């Protein structure tokens, strides 16, 4: 309110000066909250934003996606900063190439867009461990999202380092960043105001609180996740606008009217249905909120792809587990390949009607193409490509092995004996169990499986447990216990198995594998070739594979899993070259039937129009 009074006083002085014959002063530069809205350069301003994540879009396409978002009527882009991609190991930072967040923000500015930055450190985002680097979990005593000194010290180092990249891009320094979000939906997690105040102090030391700083929460969590001195905004999905804005207005009657996330779509999880939401309803609610004076950020305006190993997993109780797919299409207005879907024009029309600015023509779609893919040329058995092992009395987690993603093969000797029950307590998150390289069973955390019945053994045998990190949970208190691999006791009929060898398989450089022409069955790498005459966007159809990971040259395109609901991997033109392109697929249950083709559109399984409760 003090700011609003100052603005009114400034306007009155300007009017008085004009009446006296003097030239009115130029509007004060800057961006601020005034009452229930924003002012920019002294004039009322309505933020109309959309979320885009730089790490989910090939860098060559950043400007294209930003341009299409602006053409829809947006004036701002919102993005998270993803700690785990920028600090893969403690004190080792990467802001290059695909991870150059400052370049993405400058690209937004070049397209005439403002930016809202959400540094976290927790971001959720259906992203691995909610954006936290997994090495934080190596210390099992460290408590994420708390005032634990070990945690806050790591956060301080990260936020200060991030500030070196983005502080020059704040509006006050000539950049496009008009606002910064403190934490992320903290009210859905806890209500420790000391934690939020400490994080606010960290932001200030990093120079990230020099402009508008705000908190963002779901409607039922506003009181828990807000600070009295900061503006509070509300997050919700389509169909919930009237209820959510009423709760925000009741919580802060004279406060900022803004929707920090309007979920105009939803994400997919392995083994579940593909989500599609009602674009007509979303356009209707956009119109309602804009007419009511709300600033809005669409989540997502363009989802893109969670390339590589970086998908997260949903969990509400800590015992349920729902890993997210590689595709982050989100049924957004701009689809995974950057093409406007029907929602785009509907929402553009709603924005134009309220703002009075004519809608730009809907951009033409990019036509995807297909390319021939060879049969499997060569293969490499996992058993023949193991590194030197790490030895320990009991199994070590991925984090204790200093490994973030991929697989670990755990090996131990079994005594002779009859069949028994093998228990892998706290197995995270998918395992195949072998006795003398013969598959004895599969365990899937999604299904709550932790036991396998082993066969009888006439002599000493070798037990191998191949464990995949299928994505650490990114939501709920489960994040605090998301160590990956064999995280608890491993017993055979109640007796602890000891003296383990562990083979680290991060699979960050498949080019070093030893391929042969010999056929391969079981956990195998397969090599094929795609011949490209002229690079263009395409989709690799993975219905001829089972479960695993796929690389195009040096690019890790992501996971495939025959359970769906997504049966294609988006393959962007900038990552293709003319001529022969090498494809490597790791299939945990490979066999001679494995094959790949390309298609010109994504392939989804069963569709649902229902969004799960968040």
Task: Please report, for each region that a protein language model flagged, where it lies by residue.
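Aromatic-lined ligand-binding clefts that engage carbohydrates, nucleic acids, or primary amines
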Residues: 420-434, 463, 530-553, 560-561, ...
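Active-site neighborhood of glycoside hydrolase catalytic domains
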Residues: 153-227
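Aromatic- and acidic-residue-enriched segments that line the glycan-binding/catalytic groove
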Residues: 91-97, 110, 121-146, 196-200, ...
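Catalytic-core region of carbohydrate-active enzymes that cleave or remodel glycosidic bonds
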Residues: 206, 237-335, 339, 350
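N-terminal carbohydrate-binding accessory modules
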Residues: 23-76, 106
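A cross-kingdom feature marking solvent-exposed beta-strand/loop segments within repeated
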Residues: 320-321, 340-343, 400, 409, ...
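Aromatic-lined substrate-binding rim segments of carbohydrate-active enzymes
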Residues: 62-128, 200, 204
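An active-site-proximal structural segment forming one wall of the substrate-binding cleft
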Residues: 100-117, 141-177
């Amino acid at each position: 309110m003090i700011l609003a009074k100052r603005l009114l006083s400034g306007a009155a002085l300007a009017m008085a000066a004009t009446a006296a014959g003097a030239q009115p002063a130029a509007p004060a530069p800057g961006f601020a909250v005034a009452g229930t809205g924003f002012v920019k350069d002294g004039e009322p301003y309505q933020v109309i934003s959309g979320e885009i994540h730089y790490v989910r879009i090939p860098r060559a396409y950043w400007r294209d996606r930003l341009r299409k978002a602006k053409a829809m009527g947006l004036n701002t882009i919102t993005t998270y900063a993803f700690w785990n991609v920028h600090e893969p190991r403690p004190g080792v930072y990467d802001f290059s190439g695909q991870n150059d967040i400052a370049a993405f923000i400058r690209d937004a500015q070049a397209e005439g867009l403002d930016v809202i930055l959400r540094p976290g450190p927790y971001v959720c985002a259906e992203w691995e461990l909610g954006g936290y680097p997994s090495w934080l979990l190596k210390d099992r005593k460290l408590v994420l999202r708390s005032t634990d000194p070990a945690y806050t010290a790591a956060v301080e180092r990260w936020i200060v380092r991030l500030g070196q990249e983005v502080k020059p891009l704040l509006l006050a320094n000539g950049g496009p960043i008009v606002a910064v979000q403190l934490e992320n939906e903290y009210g859905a997690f806890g209500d420790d105001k000391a934690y939020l105040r400490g994080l606010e102090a960290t932001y200030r030391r990093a120079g990230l609180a020099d402009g508008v700083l705000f908190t963002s929460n779901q409607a039922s969590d506003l009181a828990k996740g807000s600070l009295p001195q900061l503006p509070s905004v509300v997050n919700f999905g389509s169909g919930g606008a009237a209820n959510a804005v009423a709760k925000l207005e009741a919580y802060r009657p004279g406060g900022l009217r803004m929707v920090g996330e309007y979920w105009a779509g939803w994400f997919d999880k392995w083994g579940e249905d593909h989500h599609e939401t009602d674009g007509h309803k979303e356009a209707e609610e956009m119109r309602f909120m804009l007419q009511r004076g709300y600033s809005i950020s669409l989540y997502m305006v363009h989802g893109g792809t969670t390339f590589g190993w970086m998908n997260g997993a949903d969990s509400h109780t800590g015992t349920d587990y729902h890993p997210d797919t590689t595709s982050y299409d989100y049924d957004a207005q701009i689809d995974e390949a950057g093409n406007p879907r029907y929602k785009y024009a509907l929402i553009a029309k709603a924005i134009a009607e309220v703002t009075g600015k004519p809608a730009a023509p809907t951009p033409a779609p990019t036509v995807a193409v297909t390319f021939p893919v060879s049969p499997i040329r060569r293969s490499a058995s996992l058993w023949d490509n193991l590194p030197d092992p790490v030895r320990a009395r009991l199994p070590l987690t991925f984090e204790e092995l200093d490994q973030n993603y991929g697989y670990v093969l755990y090996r131990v000797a079994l005594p002779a004996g009859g069949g028994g029950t093998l228990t892998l307590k706290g197995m995270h998150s998918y395992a195949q169990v072998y006795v003398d390289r013969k598959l004895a069973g599969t365990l899937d955390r999604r299904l709550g499986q932790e036991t396998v019945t082993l066969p009888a053994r006439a002599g000493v045998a070798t037990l191998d447990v191949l464990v995949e990190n299928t994505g650490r949970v990114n939501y709920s208190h489960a994040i605090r216990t998301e160590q990956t691999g064999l995280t608890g006791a491993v017993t055979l009929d109640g007796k602890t198995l000891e003296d383990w060898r562990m083979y680290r398989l991060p699979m960050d450089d498949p080019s070093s594998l030893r391929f042969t022409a010999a056929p391969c069955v079981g956990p195998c790498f397969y090599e094929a070739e795609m011949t490209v005459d002229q690079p263009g966007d395409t989709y690799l159809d993975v219905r001829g594979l089972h479960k695993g990971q796929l690389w195009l040259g040096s690019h890790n395109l992501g996971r495939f899993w025959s359970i769906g609901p997504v049966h294609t991997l988006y393959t962007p033109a900038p990552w293709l070259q003319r001529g022969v392109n090498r494809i490597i697929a790791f299939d945990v249950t490979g066999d001679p039937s494995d094959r790949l083709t390309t298609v010109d559109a994504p392939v989804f399984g069963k569709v649902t129009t229902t969004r799960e409760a968040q």
